[in-house]
Amino acid sequence: EDLKLVCQILNGYAILIPIEMTLLHIPNHIAIIPDGNRRWAKEHNLPTFEGHRRGFDVATKIGKKIRSLGVHTLTMWAFSTENWERSKDEINYLMRMYELFIEKNLRQALKEKIRIIHLGRKDRIPKTLLKRIQNSEEKTKTFDKYILNIALDYGGTDEVIRAIHRLSEDNIDLNNLTIEQFSNFLDTANQPYPNPDLIIRTSGEQRTSGLMIWQAAYAEYIFLNKHFPDLKNEDIDYAVEEYARRQRRFGK
């Protein structure tokens, strides 16, 4: 049966989404912790690198799916501050793959008006990769239809510490510091939807690992019992439908 689509105005733009999704409350910001690439490879008797390659392919497809639902902001946690402890060969492979991922997403971003933003440290990223990231940020900085946050060399506590350092450099009066002021020093500063509404983690792991610990205070979490390379569009539909069923109280 043909997919029935309907035109809706979301985030100021006319888009086509599945008609059944119009009845749901679509999150403005989804963050994904893509866990399980290495375990997927091991279970399929494949090298670790193949698990990561499959994961990159899935990340691109899932990004398109999420945008098709009208979600404005997607945060993809690509590489944590702790991932540097992995083998040198694996890290080098991942950094090369991130270069290709950034290049591929830039082409898509220019077509779809997606703003690419890097979350995380910049001082430890290889120069060639950092150059691609900065080029992508520069070329898409005026776009506002969608945002793709790529969290690379990112850690939630590290983000908070870096924000505190910037506060001290700007001589902010800490005695009168507000939540809004502090938020302006985080990596998500000046974004329309800096706080994730829904965080999806794959591979059955039920922990946050510190992703966006400041911004995610009232986020809804959905833990999927499948490795990231096995993630399908239907899993995103399920997560959004489950999110819509929940009643968010925001502490009230």
Where are these regions (language model features)?
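Flexible, compositionally biased loop and terminal segments
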Residues: 14-252
